[in-house]
């Protein structure tokens, strides 16, 4: 599998990473308002449909969810059998030994929750059928597809109950069944899949909470707790999700005055809970902390891009002397504008130099 979709392979998107400063500003000036308008249009249209929301449905919401989820899961299982055992890819190869072999220490380099759960399921499958990892990978994908089907069908039912539009609901269901990247990633052993499945439902729950607040209704404790659990799961499955929470909190509290104290309490808990829970997991399995290189992948990639585009002329001699202690000069040839892994690894080899004088590195 590739990181690229057919859309990202288009040359127009490839060139964005090589734009001049003015070009970047122009791209931002065009794309940011467009996507902001698109989100605003979608949510305001959904809000207008609330007046057409049916007070009664022939089926209860959980029955609709079971039907949509059952159809989706059945289709996913057929596709998984056709592609048996699914895709064993990305970071799970580094995570699995931590579960399978006692002599391999745990590390928080990758999300521990995914290491424990994902590695545990594959290990169980391996012990059930000890020929190779095939059955374990299949078992993992069976579980992951159940999570995806549950979350995606919740989104379909949410949309249907908000709009009452059966055609829109059917098209949404077909999208989750027929869109190749969605189906392929649903059977891929990567943390991103379950993370964004939980995040999808969390976003819909947050939408419902703030729609109620704007209508001067009071969300129940159950709504807050359910949303919090989903957000925590997303954060524990993908470390960088937590970075957006302070910005989301500030924006939400600033724009919505109703029950502001309740909002502030919720967002404070949400910012702290993933950190505390992750520390608890690290203590429970005696895991070593993750590398700081993970958090620095964006500036590493930016430095490499400037070096590749403009060469040594873009740096002073003092900067170059220090830069070559942080990364081997020939490693800049590994720069890829699409993914930062190669450059991140090159800097990671000399991370002790960077961490020894953080001020100079900054």
Annotate each predicted stretch with a short phrase.
Residues 223-238, 249-250, 270-275:
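Membrane-interface alpha helices of multi-pass inner-membrane proteins
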Residues 19-26, 112-116, 127-153:
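Loop-to-helix entry region of an early transmembrane alpha helix in multi-pass inner-membrane enzymes
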Residues 33, 142-163, 201:
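Transmembrane-helix motifs of polytopic, lipid-linked glycan transferases
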Residues 83-97, 104-121, 127-135:
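Extracytoplasmic catalytic/substrate-binding loops of multi-pass membrane glycan-assembly enzymes
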Residues 17-76:
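Start-transfer (signal-anchor) and selected internal transmembrane alpha helices
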Residues 287-362:
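Membrane-proximal stem/loop segments at transmembrane-domain junctions that anchor or position
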Residues 100, 154, 194-214, 231:
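Specific aromatic-rich, kink-prone transmembrane helix
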Residues 1-2, 31-36, 60-88, 272-283:
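Transmembrane signal-anchor helices characteristic of membrane glycosylation enzymes that use polyprenol
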